[in-house]
Amino acid sequence: MKLHPLCLLLFVALPLFSAAQYRPHLLVLTDVNIIDAGHPAPTAHQTIIIKEGRIVKIQSGITTFPDSAVIINLKGRYLIPGLIDSHVHMATDPSGTDNRSHTLQVLQEMLYSGITTVRDMAGDGRVLAGLARDANIGEIVSPDIYYSALMAGPSFFSDPRTQASTKGGVGGGMPYMKAITDTTNIALAIAQAIGSGASGIKLYADLSADLVMKVVNEAKKQNIPVWGHAWLQGAKPSDIVKAGAISISHAPLLIYDKMNKVPDSWKKAGPGADFWDKNLPSLDELFILMKQRRTILDATLLTYKKWAMTDTAMQWDYQIAKRITSHAYASGVLICAGTDDDQEQFVQEEMRLLVTDAGFSPFDAIVAATKNSAGAINLDSTKGSIAVGMDADLVVLTRNPLENIDNIKSVDLVIKGGRVYQHFAASAP
C-alpha cells in the first residue's frame, strides 16, 4: 500500500495556473464525509474505492490495499456527486461567440468548479459530437457532454440561432435540428437524430399535442428520451407531460397551462409580492400530474433572474418563475438544476437561487444539481449519486455545503470518470 501526497500525484504546469488530470487504475479516497441524495446528513469517515472510473466499494475506515493503489487521504473533507448542469448551450454559433477557443475555456472552468456533466439543449450537433468525444476520453478538460436533437415546427427555423447552428447545411433539415409536421416520417427523423449522436430529442416550438404524442411514442420505441420546452404554442405543458417527456424546461412557461396570453398588467406590476401572490393562478393539477409521471422540471431560474435585472419589462417572468418553482417544490415535483445562461455563471448560481428565492434547503439544491439533473438526462443509473456501480464523478469540498449553499464553491479537487483534476495557484515569479 502506497500513500501518495496529492501534490506529487497531480501536476501539469500551465502559464497562469497549474492544472492536472490523473487516472490511476485503482484510486482510494479515505476519511471523507459523504453527502448525496442517499445521505442527507454527512456520513463520516468513509473510504471510497474507485476502479477503472467506477465506484466499486464504499466502507467505513481504512483497510489494506494493493501496492498499486493510489490513496488520497482527504482528512474529513466533504464528498458530493459531480454537479450536473441540465441546461447549457455550448454550440449555438460555433463560427462566432461559441468558437472553439472560448468554448474550451468555459468547459475547463466548469469542470474545475465541480461540474462533471452538462446537457446541451440545442446547438450545432456536428460540433457537439466532437466536443463530447474529446471530453469522454479526456482529450479536453471538460464535463461530459450530452446533447439534444431539436425538433420544432417549420416556422421556428427563421430564428437566426438555428441558422448559425446549421451553417453550411439546411436549416430545419439537419439530423440534429429538424422541422417536423404531421406529414414527417417521425420514425426516420428520430433514427437520424440518434445517428447524430444526440442523447435526447428536444421539442421546441409550434408543435401540436398530437404531434408531440407521435414523437414521444416513437422515441420510446427507439429508446431515446424526449425533453420538452414547457410550452410549444400548440401543445400545453400538461400535453407534454401526458405524452411522456421526461423533463420540461422553464418554470414561467408552466403558466400557459392556465392561460393563452400573459395579462398586460403583469408586465407593469414590478416585484411587489402582494400582486404576484394574489394573481398567480394555481397550477396544482399540473403539479399533481408531473409528480405522478415523475416529470422533472428544469426551472432555469438564473436566466430569468438576469433578464429581470437588465429589463424591467421582464420582471414578471422572474416573479412567476420563482413562485412556480417554489410551489412545484412544495408539491413534490422533481426539480433539476439548469442555467440556460450565457456561460458567465454556472450551475452553482442556479443552486443558490433555488435556496434563496424558491425555498429549497441546501440539501435539496444539491439533489437538484446531482440526482435530479442526472434523471433529467436519463443518466440516473450511472451518475448523480455516490454508490457502488456509479461513475466516479465526485467533488471534494473543504466546507460543509449543508451549512451554507455557497460552500458548494469550496472545491478542493474534482474527479470525473476516475480522473483526478485539481487547480493549483501559480507560484509568483
Predicted features along the sequence, with ranges:
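C-terminal cap of metal-dependent C-N hydrolases
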Residues: 32, 371, 375, 391-428
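His/Asp/Glu-enriched, well-ordered alpha-helical/loop segment
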Residues: 315-400
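Divalent-metal coordination cores built from histidine and acidic residues
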Residues: 74, 78-88, 100-229, 245-246, ...
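Conserved beta-strand scaffold positions in the cores of enzyme catalytic domains, especially
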Residues: 28, 69-73, 145-147, 414, ...
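Bacterial Sec-dependent N-terminal signal peptides
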Residues: 1-23
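Histidine/acidic-residue-rich catalytic or RNA/ligand-binding cores of hydrolases
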Residues: 94-98, 128, 236-245, 258-264, ...
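Histidine-rich, glycine-flanked metal-binding segment
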Residues: 25-27, 34, 38-80
